[in-house]
Amino acid sequence: MKILVTGASGFIGSYIVEEALRQGMETWAAVRPTSSRKYLQDERIHFINLNLSSEEELEKELAPHEFDYIVHAAGATKCLHAEDFYKVNTEGTKHLVNAILHLGMPIKRFVLKKSNSLLIKKWLKQWKVV
């Protein structure tokens, strides 16, 4: 089983990575280049850079992979302007979902860990959201 965890350097994301490793999954962690990898030291973790601001870039970055599970935990929790919060959280999620759909990636489950998940419900209707 192959899993991708976005926001893997965050508090919740790092625990999801830890649990995936414990269950023996091939674990891929998407973190920003500037993020700390302090809690992601296990040598079994594979790292991937994902540009959530560009659907086209996401397609290129994801194309070599076929993930069984994707846990999307990346997002901004603090922004000076509401537009930035929307752009990072809602648009970034939309780009990720559209890239996966365009690639036809046969994932088994897409898990969205967001407080604004209702805003993007229409892009997720093809998958089960937990």
Describe each PLM feature range:
Residues 36-43:
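Short loop/helix-cap segments at secondary-structure boundaries that form the rim of catalytic
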Residues 72, 91-130:
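Conserved Rossmann-fold NAD(P)-dependent oxidoreductase catalytic core, especially the SDR/UDP-sugar
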Residues 46, 50-95, 99-102:
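NAD(P)H-binding glycine-rich loop region in Rossmannoid oxidoreductase-like domains
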Residues 26, 44-46:
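Conserved beta-strand segments of alpha/beta enzyme cores
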Residues 2, 26-28, 106-109:
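Residues at the starts of beta-strands that form the adenosine-phosphate
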Residues 1-23:
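N-terminal Rossmann NAD(P)H-binding glycine-rich loop of SDR-like oxidoreductase domains
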Residues 30-35, 51-52:
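N-terminal Rossmann-fold cofactor-binding loop
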Residues 7, 31, 114:
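Short beta-strand/turn micro-motifs composed of small residues
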